[in-house]
Amino acid sequence: MEASLSNHILNFSVDLYKQLKPSGKDTAGNVFCSPFSIAAALSMALAGARGNTAKQIAAILHTNDDKIHDHFSNFLRKLPSYAPDVALHIANRMYSEQTFHLKAEYTTLLQKSYDSTIKAVDFAGNADRVRLEVNAWVEEVTRSKIRDLLAPGTVDALTSLILVNAIYFKGLWECQFKPSATKPGDFHLTPQTSKTVDMMHQKGDFKMGHCSDLKVTALEIPYKGNKTSMVILLPKDVEGLSVLEEHLTAPKLSALLGGMYVTSDVYLRLPKFKLEQSIGLKDVLMAMGVKDFFTSLADLSGISATGNLCASDVIHKAFVEVNEEGTEAAAANAIRLRYMCLRFPQVINFFVDRPFMFLIHSHDPDVVLFMGSIREL
C-alpha cells in the first residue's frame, strides 16, 4: 500500500517537474515545488470529482482506484514519529461558502483520510477577509515561511470553496557542516561564466549512485533520525542539467535512488541557497491532462449537488533554505537499467559547483516531499 503512494508521487513529481522546468529559449531560472503538497490537494479534489474530471485527475496522479486516499491517510498518521529529529508538518483545510451545501460523504472522507479541517466562511459578503484568513493560516502552519499565498483579487464573491494544503519541513543534517569551513567558491552558471557563492565543506561517508544514461552522479545527505534526506543529482558537465531533465523518467530516478550505496571518504562541497517560488498551476495541470477541472465541463458532483462548480486555479508557493545546520522548506507527483560498479579513488570529490537538481524525500514510505533545480545562485 505504501509502495503505491511512493509510485504515485514519484511519477507525478517527474511529470510535474518536466512542465515547470525552463524550456525553449528560456534556459535560465530555478525550480522548486512540493509534488507531495500538490498531489495531496489534487487527491482531495479527486475525492469529489466524477466522470471525465475524475479520470483526468486520476491519470496525472497515476492511480486508478480510491485507495490513494488510504495511502495518504497512512502516511499522514506516521508524521508524529518523525519528531523530534525533524519537523514535518502537513495541514489540510477546506474553506467553503457558508451558504454552499457540501455532501456529508465528501467532508467525512476529507476529515478521515486527510485530517482536513472544514471551515464555513462568507465569500459572498467579505471575500477579501476570507483571503486574509487563509493567508494567516498558511503562514502559521509554515512557520511564517509562506506568506501571502493568495494575492489580492484571487478570491471574490463568486468563490465557493478553497482547498488548501500546507507543508513545512525543517531538518538538521545528521552530520552538520562547520560554519568555519564555509568559504567563497565558484558556482559555474555556464562554461564561460561563474559566480562567487558561499560554499559549505564536509568530508565523510555518503550514499552515492551513478546513471550513465542521465550522465549524473547522485549523493544523499541524511537528516537527523535517518527518516528523511536530501539527494543531490549532479550532472557531469556545466550544461548537463538540460540533458538530465530531457531524459529523466520515474523508472530511471527510482532505479538511481534504489541503487545508491555507502561510499567512504567523500569530499563534499555544497552551496548555501535559498529559494522561494509562487506558481499558478492551471496551465501546467491542463498541459498534463487535467482540462475539465477548470472549465464548465467540470463534474465535481461528489463535493456538492449544486452545479456550476469548477476550479479557477491551483496556486502553489514553496520555500527552501539550505545552510550548515540543515534544511528548512515549506509549500502551500519497466526500464531495466544497469549501473556501473564504480571504483573510486581514495578520496572522491563531489563538488556541487554547477547547475544541479535536488529532492527531499521521506524513507518510510519513500515519498518525494520537495523537488527542484538550481541554475542560478
UniProtKB/Swiss-Prot annotation:
This is Ipis-1. Gene3D superfamilies: Alpha-1-antitrypsin, domain 1, Antithrombin, subunit I, domain 2. The keyword Glycoprotein applies. Induction: Blood feeding does not affect expression in salivary gland. GO terms for biological process: immune system process. Keywords: Glycoprotein, Immunity, Protease inhibitor, Secreted, Serine protease inhibitor. Glycans are attached at residues 11, 226. Its main location: secreted. One of its GO terms (molecular function) is serine-type endopeptidase inhibitor activity. The keyword Transmembrane does not apply. It holds the Pfam family Serpin. It is found in: Secreted. Coiled coil: none annotated. InterPro entries: Serpin_CS, Serpin_dom, Serpin_fam, Serpin_sf, Serpin_sf_1, Serpin_sf_2. Female salivary gland. Not detected in midgut and other tissues. Signal peptide: none annotated.
